[in-house]
Swiss-Prot record:
Localization (cell): Cell junction, Tight junction; Cell membrane
Stated family: Belongs to the claudin family.
Organism of derivation: Mus musculus (Mouse)
Protein name per its UniProtKB record: Claudin-22
Extracellular-side positions: 32-81, 142-164
Keywords recorded for this protein, A-Z: Cell junction, Cell membrane, Membrane, Tight junction, Transmembrane, Transmembrane helix
Length: 220
C-alpha cells in the first residue's frame, strides 16, 4: 500500500511540475508582462514582454515589434530574460530526470539507487526553476508598482500596469516549487518493509525449535 501511494504521489507531482513548466514557457514568450492604457486614446493599448512590445488598435489590430537591443532594455527585463531562459532549460532537465526516476518505470533491481538519485536531482532542478520564475516576475511587478505610484511623474503621463503574464508566472512558479519539493521528499521516503511475511515465516520456525527442545528434555 505504501509503494502504491508513493508511486501515485510521484506521478501527481510530476504532472504538476509539467504544468508549471509549460506555463513558465508561456510566461517567458508572451508579450503581456505590462499593459498600458492610454486615457486620451482608448482605442489604443500597449503591451510589453521580455522579447517584444505590441500595440493593439481597433482598426489595425495587433502589431508587435521585437526589441532592437538587449543592452537598451531596463535592468529588470535584462535579468528576467536570462533567468526565464535558464528556468525553461532547468525545468526540462528536471522533468526528464524525474521521469526516469519514477517507481513505475522499471530499470531493474540493481538500479534502485540510481532511480532515487535521479528523482532527487529532478526535484531539486524543478523547485530551483520555480524560484527562477518567481524572482523576475516579482521584480518586474515591484518595479511596476513603484513607477505607478511615483509622485514625481505628472498625472497626465500614462503608467504601466500588471499584465496577465505576471499572474501566469506566479502560478507557474508555485507549481514548479511545489512539484519539485514533493518529488524530492518522495525520493527520500522509503516504504516500511512488509512485517507480516517476516512473522509468517518466523512463527513456524520457532514452533519447530520448541518441539525439538521438548523432545530432548521431556521434563519441559
Amino acid at each position: 500500500m505504501g509503494l502504491v501511494f508513493r508511486t501515485a504521489t510521484q506521478a501527481a507531482a510530476l504532472l504538476l511540475s509539467l504544468l508549471g513548466w509549460v506555463l513558465s514557457c508561456l510566461t517567458n514568450y508572451l508579450p503581456h508582462w505590462k499593459n498600458l492604457n492610454l486615457e486620451l486614446n482608448e482605442m489604443e493599448n500597449w503591451t510589453m514582454g521580455l522579447w517584444k512590445s505590441c500595440v493593439i488598435q481597433e482598426e489595425v489590430g495587433r502589431q508587435c515589434k521585437d526589441f532592437d537591443s538587449f543592452l537598451a532594455l531596463p535592468a529588470e527585463l535584462q535579468v528576467s530574460r536570462v533567468l526565464m531562459s535558464l528556468c525553461n532549460g532547468l525545468g526540462l532537465l528536471g522533468l526528464l530526470a524525474s521521469g526516469c526516476g519514477l517507481d513505475c518505470l522499471r530499470l531493474g533491481e540493481t538500479q534502485e539507487g540510481l532511480k532515487k538519485r535521479l528523482l532527487t536531482l529532478g526535484g531539486t532542478l524543478l523547485w530551483t526553476s520555480g524560484v527562477m520564475v518567481l524572482v523576475p516576475v516579482s521584480w518586474v511587478a515591484h518595479k511596476t508598482v513603484r513607477e505607478f505610484w511615483d509622485e514625481t511623474m505628472p498625472e497626465i503621463v500614462p503608467r504601466w500596469e500588471f499584465g496577465e503574464a505576471l499572474f501566469l508566472g506566479w502560478f507557474a512558479g508555485f507549481c514548479l516549487v511545489l512539484g519539485g519539493c514533493v518529488l524530492h521528499c518522495a525520493a527520500c521516503w522509503s516504504p516500511a518493509p512488509a512485517a507480516s511475511s517476516h512473522y509468517a515465516v518466523a512463527g513456524p520456525r520457532d514452533h519447530q525449535q520448541h518441539l525439538e527442545l521438548k523432545q530432548a528434555n521431556p521434563e519441559i
